[in-house]
Regions:
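Short, flexible coil/turn micro-motifs enriched in small/turn-prone residues
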Residues: 128, 135, 174-176
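An internal, acidic/charged active-site-proximal segment
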Residues: 153-197
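Dynamic "connector" segments at or just before major functional cores
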Residues: 1-99, 103-116, 126, 135-146, ...
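Short, flexible loop/turn motifs enriched in small residues
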Residues: 124-130
Length: 197
């Protein structure tokens, strides 16, 4: 199968063996890159009667429904740390260049515990939002993501990412590239502290 020949081995990073849940996750990733839509529209796009590409057939997802996609996202959330650790072990090492940035997105509805009013990049008045930080390797390939409450300042997200890279990923000496709004003098002091271990 073509998916199994992807150079980075994303299929194996997500789950070692072929399974429906792995195919659902891969299908959502590929569909999001090719033609981003809602989960309902994505499921319909996989369906044998409405598919606009062969993705549903290749991954055997022609009968997938929206609920299955949400279940796959819950499954993926439980695997997030393991997947991030694997990506970090493959693509980060001492001396690596790490790209870090923060953005936000507004929310519809009011069921998200992390949804708060904060600096709104989307210019959507009266909407709660979430903030998320993304760690990427030197080529811009994502390694890890963390979601924060919507009223979290960009600068306050950075220290936890330094800790994540140093402690969880075991990468002590790196070059961080981020924007000026994140790299404050107090964050710089934390960066230049001697690393234990």
């Amino acid at each position: 199968m073509y998916i199994e020949r992807v150079p980075i081995g994303l299929d194996k990073i997500i789950a070692g063996k072929t399974s429906r849940i792995r195919n659902l996750v891969l299908g959502m990733i590929i569909a999001r890159i090719i033609n981003p839509k809602s989960k309902l529209a994505t499921a319909r796009g996989f369906h044998e009667k409405t598919c606009s590409n062969s993705l549903g057939k290749v991954l055997n997802l022609e009968k997938a429904d929206e609920d299955e996609l949400y279940e796959a996202l819950d499954w993926l959330l439980n695997k997030q740390e393991k997947i991030e650790n694997k990506l970090a072990s493959l693509y980060l090492d001492n001396g690596s260049l790490i790209l870090y940035d923060v953005t936000s997105t507004y929310l519809e509805g009011n069921g998200c515990e992390l949804g708060k009013y904060g600096y709104n990049r989307d210019k959507k008045k009266g909407k709660t939002q979430i903030v998320f930080g993304l760690i990427c390797d030197k080529n811009g390939c994502p390694i890890a993501v963390e979601v924060f409450e919507g009223n979290t300042s960009d600068t306050s997200t950075f220290l936890s990412q330094i800790e994540k890279v140093r402690k969880r990923f075991g990468v002590k000496n790196v070059v961080w590239v981020t924007d000026r709004g994140i790299l404050t003098s107090s964050n710089i002091k934390e960066l230049v502290k001697p690393v234990e271990g």
